[in-house]
Amino acid sequence: MSNRMSQSLNEEDPQIAEAIANEERRQHEGLELIASENFVSEAVLQAAGSVFTNKYAEGYPGKRYYGGCEYADVVENLARDRAKELFGAEHANVQPHSGSSANMEAYGAILQPGDTILGLNLAHGGHLTHGHPLNFSGKTYKIVPYGVTKETETIDYDELEKLALEHHPKVIVGGGSAYPRIFDFKRMREIADKAGALFMVDMAHFAGLVAGGAHPSPVPHAHVVTTTTHKTLRGPRAGMILSKQEFAAAIDKVTFPGMQGGPLVHIIAAKAVCFKEAMEPSFKDYANQVVANAKVLAQSLADQGFRIISGGTDTHLMLIDVFAAGMLGSEAEKALGEAGITVNKNAIPFDTNPPMKPSGVRIGTPALTTRGMKEPEMRQVGIWIAESLRHRTDPDFLGRVRRQVHELCDAYPLYPERRATRLATV
């Protein structure tokens, strides 16, 4: 073996090593409140960085196009079986590389180009892959969006039913990326049946809450369910499709060879690990704490005078109308970043501002909950957010908040053994 094959990352590529070290430091020292982000376990990290990254395994367990796949088969079978057990699904395909890939492949299995999709408007909390005109979904299929009411900022199911009966979509899609309330899966399935449509749910954001029993499951109601495996599920950045058995063959065929070649076996291994972790009793505690933390944080911000979209949250995320407080979402994101608090700017329902300068910010609690923070910390975080936004043009004030944030993060260390090893080698 050449010397290069045994060199450490520091030796081979100090620039990348430094970037990784800096990112590790950033994650440790700041409050991660982006709703789609989380911290995986050391076990998930190890699986994702394993020698399975070397292995090609086109096909499915027992039906590969390459030799030497016996252990890849073990990994994928474990991932599939655990996913089915965890979510009570009849079929699981764990090969999608991302949530967007999973949606593309699910559509490919149940739709033809030009078919109609009824999906939640992106501006009302949906996702790009649910029909945005710049996305493949909007370019490939006819899109009819449904939305929320101005009064409650929650889904208007009467309008949804009216649209379904008028347009007769091939599929109705539930789920989104910035909707803080629980979808009424039972009613959506009833509407789909009445309109002669299939019902698909994208549970990427709340899959971990479903796994932990803190959120209703769409699996009994939907024909097809897609998800990411990160976010609240706390696994690697990837995707998955669950379905009724009648759609299994079509989904598998579209995924491979239809849209993907070799699966990422190292990531599938990490998925299997995260599914096992999600079956443990402690994960139920985690999922329920995520929701409890979100409710307390939303209330803390409301107490500080900020308007919470729909009046609160039932999930891990909330949308804050910062435009009503005199600023753009982009300004709020920047100010909070300087205070050591990471959020993302986000459009709110009926937003009249452009996407890069929207009226809101999206906030979520999965990552802070993973660190062990609970209700008292959420109240304090809400105060820091509010004060930082009020003093957003005062760098000295934001610096003081950042130091307080750093102290709190030190009390809830992230990957302590990893940090100790790194510090010992400096």
Curated annotation (Swiss-Prot):
The modification N6-(pyridoxal phosphate)lysine is found at K231. Pathway: One-carbon metabolism; tetrahydrofolate interconversion; Amino-acid biosynthesis; glycine biosynthesis; glycine from L-serine: step 1/1. It is an enzyme of class 2 (transferase). Keywords: Amino-acid biosynthesis, Cytoplasm, One-carbon metabolism, Pyridoxal phosphate, Transferase. (6S)-5,6,7,8-tetrahydrofolate binds at L122, G126, H127, L128. The keyword Nucleus does not apply. It catalyses: (6R)-5,10-methylene-5,6,7,8-tetrahydrofolate + glycine + H2O = (6S)-5,6,7,8-tetrahydrofolate + L-serine. Gene3D superfamilies: Aspartate Aminotransferase, domain 1 (3.90.1150.10), Type I PLP-dependent aspartate aminotransferase-like (Major domain) (3.40.640.10). GO terms for biological process: glycine biosynthetic process from serine; tetrahydrofolate interconversion. NCBIfam families: PRK00011.1. Belongs to the SHMT family. Homodimer. This is Serine hydroxymethyltransferase. The lineage of its organism: Bacteria, Pseudomonadati, Acidobacteriota, Terriglobia, Terriglobales.
